[in-house]
Amino acid sequence: MQENSQTFYHILSNGIKIVHRWTPSPVAYVGVMVGAGTRDEKPEENGMAHYIEHCVFKGTAHHSARHIIHAIEGVGGEINAYTTKEETTFYAAILAEHVQLTLHLIAEMILEPCFKKEETEKERMVILDEIESYNDTPSELIYDDFENLVFAGSSLAQPILGTRKTLRHLSSKPEY
């Protein structure tokens, strides 16, 4: 990629790519994109990327979910994530002076999640509710029909949330 005067691209020795753009704002936006989405799932794993996205917010080997949320929100930040067909992204808006803390916590969430069965089962129920809500939204369903038509036979035709059937069969200790 070509650098411009405000955006810088770095590749670390471990292959992780970093994009940095300086702005004079006191607020910084940070994100980590993991190259795993619906397109990487086998039919029986459909919904796994989205399930893992939810589960990593339930704590790490070193910090509880409550500690992570309080650490970010306690300094005025917000943290969230989303899953697409191509990737899963974890991101935050934070005062610039707290970027290092935020990146550390996001990295810990991704690299050292603690999948406790009780918590992952709660997330399974949350996602089952999401699926129910999604299935009550005609505009979402027509979009799924379109993707099924265009991407028939491909993992890209699979819904990001998974299905009730596949979600019930995913392990409560997901591996990734």
PLM feature spans:
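His/Glu-rich zincin catalytic helix
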Residues: M1-H67, Y91, H104
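Acidic/histidine-enriched segments that form metal/cofactor-coordinating
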Residues: A61, I68-Y176
